[in-house]
């Protein structure tokens, strides 16, 4: 039992709940509008996904197109005080909205059950702050998704992604003996970096999450050609971030775990 996976550490939006990661993206658009009457697009809102939300807003302000709009309106770039104001608008909107995006993505419940049947523990972490997670976690539990542990982006003094700290806090809480026996699963590049920085195997999700950027209903009616183009776009970003594997969704994870177990048995490490 030594050379096998003992824990998976899962992201939330776009990985286990909220197909397409729509809860945070729509709220960023609304928060910019509410705080400063500045328009950003959904596509722009998606670019820094995976970071903590204050850092996400900061990164949005540095996007050339957003900075140009800000300069045109205010004659300067976005300041820390501006970020605070947008974050203050973001938080109540996100807390109110997140429960509406708490249903597990197709295949998640069955995959978790299969992993637990193999003795694998289920950790989790998120770019959401604790105030949002305290609404999301019980809502997801009502739908049947209950990880063994969760960490919010503002829980740790060291910080959040792309640093390793949230993933490593899961290792401590779950009592896992080696980071090489852990898999970090995420739909965005900062979460892949988090897993790599923590010394873990990493699996990117190309269809269920932020980079693919479609609702479940839109995905169901999409042409094979459109799916292939979007999948390739998402997979290329996740592989560029260093993902060891990229699959469509969490429903495909069990086969990856078996492959990693075979590599561990041969003495390989992440």
From Swiss-Prot:
Q: Which GO terms describe its cellular component?
A: cytosol
Recorded catalytic reaction(s): these are: phosphonoacetaldehyde + H2O = acetaldehyde + phosphate + H(+)
Q: Which GO terms describe its molecular function?
A: magnesium ion binding; phosphoglycolate phosphatase activity; phosphonoacetaldehyde hydrolase activity
- Record-linked Gene3D superfamilies: HAD superfamily/HAD-like, Putative phosphatase, domain 2
Task: Tell me how the cofactor is bound.
Answer: Binds 1 Mg(2+) ion per subunit.
Q: Name one GO biological process term.
A: organic phosphonate catabolic process
Residues annotated for Mg(2+) binding in this entry: 11, 13, 187
Task: Say if the entry is tagged with keyword Magnesium.
Answer: yes
Q: Which domain of life is it from?
A: Bacteria
Needs which cofactor?
Mg(2+)
Per UniProt, the keywords (alphabetical) are: Hydrolase, Magnesium, Metal-binding, Schiff base
- EC number(s) reported in the record: 3.11.1.1
Pfam families (UniProt xref): Hydrolase (PF00702)
Assembly and binders: Homodimer.
The record's comment on protein family reads: Belongs to the HAD-like hydrolase superfamily. PhnX family.
Q: What role is this protein assigned?
A: Involved in phosphonate degradation.
Q: What is this protein called?
A: Phosphonoacetaldehyde hydrolase
Origin organism of this chain?
A: Salmonella enteritidis PT4 (strain P125109)
């Amino acid at each position: 039992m030594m050379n096998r996976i003992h824990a998976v550490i899962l992201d939330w939006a776009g990985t286990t709940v909220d197909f397409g990661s729509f809860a945070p993206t729509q709220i960023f658009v609304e928060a910019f509008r509410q705080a400063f009457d500045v328009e950003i697009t959904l596509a722009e809102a998606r670019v820094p996904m995976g970071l903590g939300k204050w850092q996400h807003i900061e990164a949005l302000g540095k996007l050339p197109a957003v900075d140009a709009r800000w300069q045109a309106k205010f004659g300067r770039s976005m300041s820390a005080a501006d970020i605070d104001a947008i974050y203050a608008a973001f938080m109540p909107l996100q807390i109110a909205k997140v429960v509406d995006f708490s249903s597990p993505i197709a295949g998640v419940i069955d995959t978790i059950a299969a992993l637990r049947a193999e003795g694998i523990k289920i950790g989790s972490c998120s770019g959401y702050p604790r105030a949002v997670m305290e609404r999301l976690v019980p809502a997801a539990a009502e739908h049947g998704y209950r990880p063994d542990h969760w960490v919010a982006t503002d829980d740790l003094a060291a910080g959040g992604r792309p640093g390793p700290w949230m993933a490593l806090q899961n290792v401590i809480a779950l009592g896992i003996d080696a980071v090489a026996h852990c898999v970090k699963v995420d739909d965005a590049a900062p979460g892949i970096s988090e897993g790599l920085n923590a010394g873990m195997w990493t699996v990117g999700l190309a269809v269920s999450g932020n980079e693919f950027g479609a609702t479940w209903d839109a995905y169901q009616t999409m042409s094979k050609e459109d799916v292939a183009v979007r999948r390739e776009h998402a997979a290329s970003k996740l592989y560029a971030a260093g993902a060891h594997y990229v699959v469509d969704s969490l429903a495909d994870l069990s086969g990856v775990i078996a492959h990693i177990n075979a590599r561990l048995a041969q003495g390989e490490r992440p």
